[in-house]
């Protein structure tokens, strides 16, 4: 079952996002199971990430194998985890961009 995942990190920056995203290879080597990914600046600062994944397992595999190591490499230790809102997707349309 496809899932959507929303994270809002008011104490983060787009610069940190760009660095960690690059280290995790999100754009250069999209993770297996990723359907859709966006990152945007929150009003007043911070970062919002919205993803759609083929399954919760695909997201958790990416998180363990690529995201957490990239975060450790960038920050030295893991920052407090952001709240994640994960929901099952009822309907998904992906027209060409």
Report the location of each language-model feature:
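Short S/T/G/P-rich N-terminal loop/turn motif that feeds into the first structured element of a domain
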Residues: 1-50, 54-66, 75-97
């Amino acid at each position: 079952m496809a899932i959507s995942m929303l994270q809002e990190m008011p104490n983060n920056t787009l610069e940190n996002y760009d660095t960690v995203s690059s280290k995790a290879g999100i754009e250069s080597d999209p993770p297996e199971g990723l359907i859709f990914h966006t990152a945007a600046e929150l009003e007043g600062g911070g970062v919002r990430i919205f993803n759609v994944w083929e399954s919760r397992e695909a997201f958790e595999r990416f998180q363990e194998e690529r995201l957490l190591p990239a975060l450790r490499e960038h920050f030295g230790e893991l920052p407090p985890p952001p709240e994640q809102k994960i929901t099952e997707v009822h309907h998904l349309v992906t027209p060409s961009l």
